[in-house]
């Protein structure tokens, strides 16, 4: 576990008695979930399903309680010595605090966060070491932390968890062999299986895009959506359920991208609708585009492409307040590329390159923009003070107990 100079006391988190109960019930809960819905098709691990573009779990999100961000710290080349932190800053406050200790669960596997309209934050803790399930915890004020029912292992994808306005939720889970989509009718207490990777791939909708992997879940106008990777040229794999059947509702890529396959990296709710971040493979090059809706319909507009050249990779992405969506791409000479997708024109605008080692940026209230940089156990908050000047406003070290998860 980790602590920091602004960490709340441990009693603010779920009790260890609760965690013992979770451990005792996890096998039963996961088994019950596995038994619900359709039976997975055998051999689901046979198809290649590794995304071409890997998206980090690092992200930021706004709720009524304040600003949140998830970052990995420690020895990032050692999975059991990588510890994910949950950073929080209340409205009007100048400093961040580390709330990872409130989760009271080892965070080596990563954190997946979700909200709807900023009312509350749901945190899913990906399994690590010998665990094979994901605890879920919900907070609306960063002080009270309510445990929800554990589910199967959340997939290693940024948008593996999604919440809807009515309290419904979707989750993407994977045991390394079978990838499934689960749904909760409300409260995150009970889950049922609504789709599997193999089941969707062999359906008429899945075959029409050449589905190879499930990568994200989300909601648009209250309708649950699944984002996928597809092998057929120019088809973006976004699926919606209608009358107990899944249908392909994603857009086609513009002809300017030529013969290209696409994978949905994320499904992000914006103030205007939904934006899907899509990785595109064109011959030997990779690009990123966004496909966005507005209003209650699923009429898509596709953005121009951002190119990932050579060793460049996707550092992080997330909501950018009223602006829409941000994407950060690694650059040369420690100068990463930060781009914001504007709505409704669906075009990219480049912002000043964030400082070195920035893991994620945070679009806060009143136009505030922070870059959160990490280096081992060191955390630094940089504020865009005007023009292209970043100003250091906070720095602290997180006390990490290396070797505690091995």
Language model regions located:
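Entry beta-strands of beta-propeller and related beta-repeat scaffolds
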Residues: 64-71, 118-123, 167-172, 221-227, ...
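Bacterial signal peptide processing site
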Residues: 37-39
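C-terminal motif of bacterial Sec signal peptides marking the signal peptidase cleavage site
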Residues: 33-35
């Amino acid at each position: 576990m980790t602590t920091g100079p602004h960490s709340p006391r441990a009693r603010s988190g779920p009790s260890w008695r609760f965690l013992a109960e979770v451990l005792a019930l996890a096998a039963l809960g996961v088994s019950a979930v596995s038994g619900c819905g359709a039976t997975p098709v055998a051999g689901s691990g046979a198809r290649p399903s590794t995304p071409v573009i890997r998206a980090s779990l690092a992200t930021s999100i706004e709720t009524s309680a304040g600003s949140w961000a998830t970052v990995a710290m420690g020895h990032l080349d050692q999975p059991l010595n990588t510890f994910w932190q949950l950073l929080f800053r209340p409205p009007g406050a100048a400093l961040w605090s580390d709330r990872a200790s409130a989760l009271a669960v080892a965070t080596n596997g990563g954190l997946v966060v979700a909200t709807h309209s900023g009312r509350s934050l749901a945190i899913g803790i990906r399994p690590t070491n010998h665990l094979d399930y994901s605890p879920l915890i919900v907070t609306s004020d960063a002080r009270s932390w309510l445990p929800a029912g554990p589910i199967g292992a959340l997939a290693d994808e940024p948008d593996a968890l999604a919440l809807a306005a009515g309290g419904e939720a979707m989750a993407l889970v994977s045991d390394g062999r079978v990838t499934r989509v689960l749904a909760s009718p409300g409260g995150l207490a009970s889950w049922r299986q609504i789709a599997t990777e193999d089941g969707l791939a062999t359906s008429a909708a899945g075959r029409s895009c050449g589905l190879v992997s499930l990568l994200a879940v989300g909601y648009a106008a209250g309708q649950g959506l699944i984002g996928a990777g597809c092998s057929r040229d120019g088809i973006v794999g976004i699926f919606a359920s209608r009358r107990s059947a899944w249908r392909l509702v994603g857009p086609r890529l513009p002809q300017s991208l030529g013969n290209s396959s696409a994978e949905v990296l994320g499904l992000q709710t914006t103030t205007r609708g939904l934006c899907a971040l899509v990785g595109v493979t064109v011959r030997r090059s990779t690009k990123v585009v966004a496909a966005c809706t507005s209003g209650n319909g699923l009429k898509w507009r596709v953005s121009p492409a951002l190119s990932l050249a050579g060793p460049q990779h996707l550092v992080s992405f997330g909501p950018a307040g009223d602006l829409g969506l941000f994407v950060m791409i690694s650059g040369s000479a420690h100068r990463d590329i930060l781009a914001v997708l504007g709505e409704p024109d669906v075009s990219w605008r480049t912002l000043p390159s964030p400082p070195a080692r920035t893991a994620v940026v945070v679009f806060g209230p009143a136009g505030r923009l922070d870059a959160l940089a990490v280096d081992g156990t060191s955390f630094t908050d940089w504020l865009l003070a005007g023009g292209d000047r970043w100003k250091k406003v906070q720095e602290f070290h997180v006390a990490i107990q290396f070797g505690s998860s091995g």
